[in-house]
Amino acid sequence: MYKEPFQPTYEYALECDKHDELKDFQTEFYKKEGTIYLDGNSLGLLSKRAEKSLFTLLDSWKEYGIDGWTEGEHPWFFLSEKLGELTAPLIGALPEETIVTGSTTTNIHQVIATFYEPKGIRTKILADELTFPSDIYALQSQIRLKGLDPDEHLVRVKSRDGRTLSEDDIIHAMTDDVALILLPSVLYRSGQILDMKRLTAEAHKRGIHIGFDLCHSIGSIPHHFKEWDVDFAIWCNYKYLNAGPGGVAGLYVNKKHFNRLPGLSGWFSSRKDKQFDMEHTLTAADHAGAYQIGTPHVLSTAPLIGSLEIFKEAGIERLREKSLHITRFMLNLIAHELSDFGFTIGNPLEDEKRGGHIYLEHAEAARICKALKANGVIPDFRAPNGVRLAPVALYNTYEEVWHSVQILKKIMKDEEYKQFENKREVVA
């Protein structure tokens, strides 16, 4: 599919673009002329199909009013379940195990409220010190709600190098007092992929339920939850899945746990045929829909309809193949062109351990990001010293990667970054 061996040349980039099996999808997305967008790991670009599906649901509201819940091309009452079915192949799950609902953080609260049952000596939640802050805030809140002290009952596995986690260290921390584990599938800074299969097996050997935050992996790498027997997972849909800012999130619960009442119940936890009976005793759905809480955010869900159609056509295996190749091309270019400018590559270099973005460390990272934006390259900054660059398989080209590295080289060589203050913006 892609030309080998790697060559750090413009001609090689053009040749790779020529043979890219996914190149036709680039025209599906709105790409600003004169800009190279490398921030799809933070917010994916708008596709024409996502835009169309949003307008379709607006038209349903216009035409049907309240009857839009059961009428139109995409009836709202069943939309969360329908999109769950379309998402399931991306995580290797059954359709009934997947639901589109809530936000990442509310879904963390839901799964922790459902699965965290401190009893006897098993009172602790195991997480890690590199995970996204919102995960920690939610875990601390849930521990407090049980009347326990997060400082004592939340265990965070330490990183040996400040960038990555050792699976051996995580397994070593699976002690007899751990009741539940929540880990990232891909670390948001370094892009390290954790071995979810191994960690799940080791947790289950010890009688511990384990779940994963998929925010930086879903839509970028394949998952095989049915095979791995993961207990639960949560994710956002606005990064690689291109559902738009504030797009409704996702939640997975292994079918073996469907007998568990949701820790946080609401009207939409109900079985569909019972919901409008208005009973004060919940008859929970017998699938992942039980873990919904309130009324679906229909208009924030709508873009995902069109986006998931694209993923179905492209295929997650092909997307991963290109992602690995184009990020490897970028890494090789960085090594070839930027070795004299003080950058450190913060990613694992092994393909099987690297997610969809490149993570560069530099003391001047904040203002380097500002200089990149001033030159038409959109990265993002992550404190304290990280530049994230995500060439997304669906819409970025090898030519764009080549140009972005040349622009970065010029910024460093001419010290253009010194025009800017070395601190982050309000939104980094």
Curated annotation (Swiss-Prot):
Pathway: Amino-acid degradation; L-kynurenine degradation; L-alanine and anthranilate from L-kynurenine: step 1/1; Cofactor biosynthesis; NAD(+) biosynthesis; quinolinate from L-kynurenine: step 2/3. Its EC number is 3.7.1.3. It comes from the Bacteria. One of its GO terms (molecular function) is kynureninase activity. One of its GO terms (biological process) is L-tryptophan catabolic process to kynurenine. It catalyses: L-kynurenine + H2O = anthranilate + L-alanine + H(+); 3-hydroxy-L-kynurenine + H2O = 3-hydroxyanthranilate + L-alanine + H(+). Pyridoxal 5'-phosphate binds at T104, T105, F132, P133, S134, D135, D213, H216, Y238, W267, T295. The keyword Transmembrane does not apply. The modification N6-(pyridoxal phosphate)lysine is found at K239. Its cofactor is pyridoxal 5'-phosphate. One of its GO terms (cellular component) is cytoplasm. Disulfide bonds: none annotated. Keywords: Hydrolase, Pyridine nucleotide biosynthesis, Pyridoxal phosphate. NCBIfam families: kynureninase. Belongs to the kynureninase family. Homodimer. Catalyzes the cleavage of L-kynurenine (L-Kyn) and L-3-hydroxykynurenine (L-3OHKyn) into anthranilic acid (AA) and 3-hydroxyanthranilic acid (3-OHAA), respectively. This is Kynureninase.
